[in-house]
Amino acid sequence: LKSLLVYLKGYVKESICAPLFKLLEASFELIVPLVIAAIIDKGIANGNTSYILSRCGILVLLAIVGMVAAITAQYFAAKAATGFGRGLRSALYQKIQSLSFNELDNLGTSSLITRMTNDTNTVQNGVNLVLRLLLRSPFIVFGAMIMAFFIDAKCALIFLAAIVLLSIVIFLIMAYTTPGYKKVQSNLDSVTLITRENYEGARVIRAFTDESNEIAEFNRRNRALSNMQKKVGKISSLLNPITYVIINIAIVVLVYSGGVKVNIGDLTQGQVVALYNYMSQILVELIKLANLLVTITKALACADRIKSVFEQESTLDHNDNKANSNSYIEFENVSLKYRNAGDMSLTDINFTVNKGDVIGVIGGTGSGKSSLVSLVPHFYDASNGTVYVNGCDVKSLDDDKLRNKIGFVQQKSVLFKGTVRDNMKWGKKNASDNDIIEALKLAQVYDTIQEKGGLDFFIAQGGANLSGGQKQRLSVARALVRKPEILILDDSSSALDFATEARMRDAIYSLDYNPTVFIVSQRASSVMSADKIIVLDDGKCVGIGTHKELLNSCEVYKEIYVSQFGKEEA
């Protein structure tokens, strides 16, 4: 938690004022038992009504001043905690944005969402309570004990014994609950993951009538979360009753000892009442402190999870490699292995691309097509070898500048909630309506959008109100808006009919700014007219050439072509 407190830096005044005003309130609270003792011993005992009324006035004044101090403390604590939460969330979001695909894959989307929402809220609540109670509760506990020593040292030893016993209990409970809360958060990640997957894949689940299995799996994970929460909760719940038992036993001993001392004249009735009130104050504050420690335990567990994200360093390598390539794009002995993967996804890939070339990438499922094109914008580091873009090692280039030259359309079409215009401006922030319309026409989706309401048509979350083909074409249009130097279409026309795909492909080939195009597909028809076709099989390059050359020289390509067009065509 200490490493995250840097986000309180802008709230130093509030972080100091909140506990100070709480200490002021606590000071007034410690005076109250002495005033009550005086009322009993001097006012009631002597029948002095004016004395009683004056002391009651002091009690009212103490209550009002204490209330004002408490409200002020709450204001400062809330301001500091909410500011801390905002800063923490913002920094965490920026950190996540800076991570490479490797780290994002490793951490998992659901876990990151939980850390951004649930964990940050828990830490924020912990900071709020710490500012209000961490000094106040111990101050009253030890203050009440000191006041008790001033009244009667022997009776005050009862206070000391109770506090020592409770400290031992709190330590033992925290030793168990701290790791327990970490397991709770881990189980919450698991529940969030399956919930997210089920909502996103609801249509697939229903298509395979697999609802009962998914419900059973959700219930299993939910039960694991619930059981862990119960397990930790049972231990945490012991804190309050044990505190009550210890304090109430201490009160019984105190009242008995006080009564004996009153009989022999060592204490007055008012002093016994004052001791009782101090013991009651200790009880209340220890209950608050116990709950605070439970909250702190949760906050520490969540803070560790957040801290682990901040400690993640991007594994993308950057260097000053001055080696150049004579080709616009070149893969030189490139291999790729994903983190925690058993096998290589790509092995010893070599090819060159000239500026303005159209490159087809074809192969079966899992052959490494997407892995290959993801190395061009430096989404991942090659495990071996070098990838050159514009003649330079991608590791020596600024990632943002490199990616601003690339239009990348991924396999899964991702659209954001908002208008068509808003989505298109992801490709180019200052794109005019004419730029957007031109891109929509190139992607063969302009007429469809016009029928739906034009550029102001509102796209639902995840593009739920669009078909798969419409989402794919809008994704292509978004990439075309920026007029990229390199256009990568990663199986981005799989949901299109052949005629629409052919029209879109012809439009891209005829672009006046002549981009270098990578077309990834399992369809031979999508890559037949490319200047160069790269054939992948199990992560290895088994053929490079034109369509005609590969039909004669590459058995894998020929098999793909024959399976789609028939033997006579080949």
Task: Annotate each predicted stretch with a short phrase.
Residues 1-32, 36, 44-60, 65, ...:
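Membrane-integrated ABC transporters
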Residues 10, 14-27, 59-62, 68, ...:
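Transmembrane helices of ABC transporter permease
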Residues 10-13, 98-102, 118-131, 135, ...:
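An intracellular "coupling" helix at the cytosolic face of ABC transporter transmembrane type-1 domains
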Residues 47-54, 147-161, 231-304, 309-310:
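Helix-loop-helix
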Residues 92, 96, 205, 226, ...:
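Helix-loop junctions and hydrophobic alpha-helical segments within the transmembrane domains
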Residues 313-324:
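Pre-NBD coupling/linker segments of ABC/ABC-like ATPases
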